Amino acid sequence: AYNYFHFMKILVLGSTGMLGTYLVRYLTDISSRLDNSENLELFSASRNGNDFYCDFSVTETMKSILNDINPNVVVNCVAITSLEYCERNPEECLKINGYAPGYLAEICKEKNSRLIQVSTDHFYEDDGPKAHKENDKTFFLNEYAKSKLIAESEITKRGRNFLILRTSIIGLTKEQRSYLDWILENINHSREVGLYFNAYTSLIHCKQLSRIILELAQNKHLSGLYNISNKNVFSKGDLYLAIAKRFGVEPIYKKEDLDSRLLKRSISCGLSPSKIESKSDLS
């Protein structure tokens, strides 16, 4: 599928986070399998090294990196994702998650680079297992969700050639303990856990999202806001049970309910990918 790949220079920002790690690994693999590996040039930037050092709180750093590379596509995976940290540090959260992406969109517009912004699914009222569409009403219960909504607004105002992807990811990395790590750890040690059957999601694996991001990067006709998610909406409790079943383990759990207001986070995070499916070959 990639033998007819048009030349592309891709910059991944936030390349040492969970999604960034998967994306860089995937793009490196694709590049090695191309007839002409020079057709896909990959650059990565993060606060932890990689090709370039990038501190998102210093906007001039972004500008100098884009000037050095002149990328065709910039994928922004940078975000402070800890809800607790965002609540304790709202100004830093707004700067990194909210306003920096808007500035990045402006630089991309100047450089004629395509921006792919990774957003979130934390935007909805408690409406059960609903598969939310892009035009459904949004709201926020915490600083993290507020900052990601601001990013969407800033990019839309200041950018030109961009894609905003609302999504929720699952995966494993060596660098940080993920939700999937927590599930596997508890299953392997037969620990009793509290499972929430009123918290809904449409999680997509980082591997699959990485593949989709590359396909979107090549599709120059798409722009705007899209949900990129699992086709199904399921509770986090059901996800836990499904993974346990796959490993042939009988899980020990007690059923619990989440109160979104008390917790200060949305629990109805289902997404519908019908818009992107109608406009592309993605599945």
Residue ranges and their predicted role:
Residues 212, 216-262, 267-268:
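Mid/C-terminal beta-alpha module of Rossmann-like enzyme folds, strongest
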Residues 13, 45, 77-78, 115-121, ...:
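SDR active-site strand-loop-helix element
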Residues 47-58:
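Rossmann-fold cofactor-recognition segment
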Residues 56-96:
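NAD(P)H-binding glycine-rich loop region in Rossmannoid oxidoreductase-like domains
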Residues 74, 88-116:
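NAD(P)-cofactor binding segment of oxidoreductase domains
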Residues 153-201, 206-208:
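NAD(P)-dependent short-chain dehydrogenase/reductase
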Residues 10-30:
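N-terminal Rossmann NAD(P)H-binding glycine-rich loop of SDR-like oxidoreductase domains
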